[in-house]
Regions:
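Secreted, cysteine-rich disulfide-bonded mini-domains of extracellular proteins
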Residues: 458-519
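Primarily the internal scaffold of c-type cytochrome electron-transfer domains
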Residues: 397-446
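Short, flexible, mixed-charge glycine/proline-rich loop motifs
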Residues: 378-385
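Conserved small-residue
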Residues: 20-361, 426, 431, 435-465, ...
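The canonical Cys-X-X-Cys-His
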Residues: 387-397
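Short, charged low-complexity linear segments at domain edges
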Residues: 352-376, 468-481
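Sec/Tat signal peptide C-region and signal peptidase I cleavage site
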Residues: 15-19
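Bacterial N-terminal signal peptides
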Residues: 5-14
Length: 519
């Protein structure tokens, strides 16, 4: 595990050094300019402008004020309950390792009092277009996500080596890209094509800071269409605890994830299942649920959706909380959400899916005329089962447990920040997302499919070739066997760029990273 952590730090350092080169990848699909985000945060896209608490008059909303809102009462209760359950589970499973707030403990809890403090608030860290998810609701044209990062208020401007006031929690406000309004402020129809056109045009703007912010919220800008009434849900991601390396364990951090749907009629946020977060413990403990899940998922239609990454698993199989430990490394373990569901993990004598079940499903899909892109072997099925979950995706090529920690515009020189705003997975997926935006703008049918979280689809091979996002130094790869026929068909294309070789980290799966040959 120590080797994996060292590799991850080195990879993040390499990405930082090339942040300027990779900046173009998010053009038209995300807003990460720190100076523009600072202006937007101080305007109507600050969290107070989105939640509009009575009497706020556009002022900053503190953590205590936010969680005192009636709409947020269920969120606070749910987070407090999860804290208590997390501590109880830890005390039961690891009685010899202390847990609490502060460095004196083996597992150091995030101080939940900071959530409800007058001295903290959520600041706008980034804005992400997710119209690539419009297959879930064509009428709403997908989603726009406002990502906020918890931070201490009143902290002095930080220098290059000072500690940032930002804290390890994000609050993601997910809005419908298209709400109920049919006409924009210019009198034109609001369509998916029109929204996509605005975003792609914004990606061509060669300005920054205040000027960029003004153009983004102008009548023709993509952010003019963002309205509080379009809120669909909020998603929270909190580093609930971290354990420094010790004599008995490697470094570990746990991230707690929750989702709360907005009930417009009741005007409150209600706890909801996490999308595709398979409830492993509940399924393995219930024979009827296990049978139903197996039957549902191996149906050729659903199997094909799983392969394409467009599946939506029914709520009855899902959990309402996810804890994502990081780093998980390359070896299959119970830290991964789908561990024990597929034969071979070693976690259970009676898995949900035997290898013969997957082989039969592959044949059935082929007989039905389905061309599978990713799941072409039992190992491919197992990997996909992990990475469609919230926690499994966040464990893959993330920055800790985050995919979008955001730009630190509180830094002394935010335009030259040395902090990478998003994960390798995020940047590696931007070509696919922009391709979908382009097809939506042009009125053609998008290809909503996506590759594994570990490796982008080949549709970005030209733009991503030679980078750490695909086959460059530090990219994830599959070490080829001497006889090509013995290679796993799901991963045999995961090779390295010229001059690099795949160094396997996990000998069983042959998964590794691309490094200079001979090293």
């Amino acid at each position: 595990m120590r080797f994996v952590v060292t590799l991850f730090v080195s990879l993040c350092s390499a990405l930082t050094a090339h942040a300027g080169q990779s900046a173009a990848l998010e053009r038209g699909t995300a807003i990460i300019d720190p100076l523009a985000l600072r202006e937007l945060d101080h305007g109507r896209l600050g969290l107070s402008g989105i939640f509009r608490p009575a009497g706020s008059s556009g002022a900053e909303i503190t953590g205590s004020q936010l969680f005192a809102l009636p709409a947020m009462a269920p969120v606070r209760r749910a987070l407090d309950d999860e804290y208590d359950r997390y501590i109880a589970r830890h005390t039961s499973s690891l009685p010899n390792e202390s847990i609490g707030v502060g460095t004196a403990f083996d597992f150091q809890l995030f101080d939940r009092a900071l959530l409800y403090s007058n001295d903290t608030r959520f600041v706008l860290a980034g804005i992400v277009n997710r119209m690539d998810r419009s297959y879930l609701s064509e009428a709403n044209c997908g989603e726009i996500r406002l990502i906020y990062r918890l931070a201490r208020m009143g902290a002095p401007e930080i220098g290059e080596n000072a500690v940032s006031p930002r804290l390890p929690m994000t609050l993601n406000v997910v809005l419908k890209a298209k709400g109920d309004h049919e006409i924009d402020s210019n009198g034109a129809a609001i369509t998916c094509a029109a929204i996509a056109r605005r975003w792609l045009a914004a990606g061509d703007l060669a300005v920054t800071g205040t000027e960029l912010a003004e153009k983004l919220v102008s009548k023709d800008g993509p952010l003019d269409l963002i309205k509080p009434e379009n809120i669909d849900r909020i998603e929270t991601n909190l580093q609930i605890a971290h354990a420094p390396k010790s004599a008995i364990r490697d470094f570990r951090t746990d991230y707690l994830m929750k989702v709360f749907n907005y009930n417009a009629k009741a005007q409150i946020f209600e706890q909801a299942p996490l999308e595709n977060q398979i409830d492993r413990e509940r399924i393995l403990a219930d024979e009827d649920l296990k049978r139903d899940f197996k039957t549902w998922l191996l149906d050729p239609t659903h199997f094909g959706e799983l392969d394409r990454g467009t599946i939506l698993i029914p709520d009855k199989f899902l959990a309402t909380v996810a804890v994502a430990p990081t780093p998980v490394g390359f070896t299959s373990s119970d830290l991964q959400p789908a561990f024990g569901l597929v034969q071979g993990d070693g976690a259970t004598a009676d898995p949900v899916f035997k290898e013969s079940d997957v082989v039969a499903a592959l044949k059935k899909a082929a007989d039905a005329g389905l061309t599978l892109q990713n799941i072409r072997s039992p190992a491919g099925f197992e990997r996909r089962l992990n990475d469609v979950t919230c926690s499994g995706c966040h464990q893959t090529r993330g920055i800790g447990g985050f995919h979008f920690p955001g730009v630190d515009w509180m830094a002394a020189k935010p335009s030259n920040s040395t902090v990478v705003p998003a994960s390798p997975h995020f940047f590696g997926d931007q070509v696919r997302r922009r391709d979908i935006l382009t097809t939506l703008r042009d009125g053609t049918q998008p290809d909503f499919s996506r590759g594994f979280s570990s490796r982008p689809q080949s549709r970005g091979s030209t733009e991503l070739a030679g980078t750490a996002y695909e086959d460059g130094w530090g990219a994830l790869c599959y070490q080829q066997k001497p006889d090509a026929a013995d290679n796993d068909i799901s991963f045999r294309s995961w090779t390295c760029a010229e001059g690099l070789a795949c160094q396997a980290v996990d000998k069983a799966s042959r998964m590794g990273m691309c490094f200079v040959k001979g090293r």
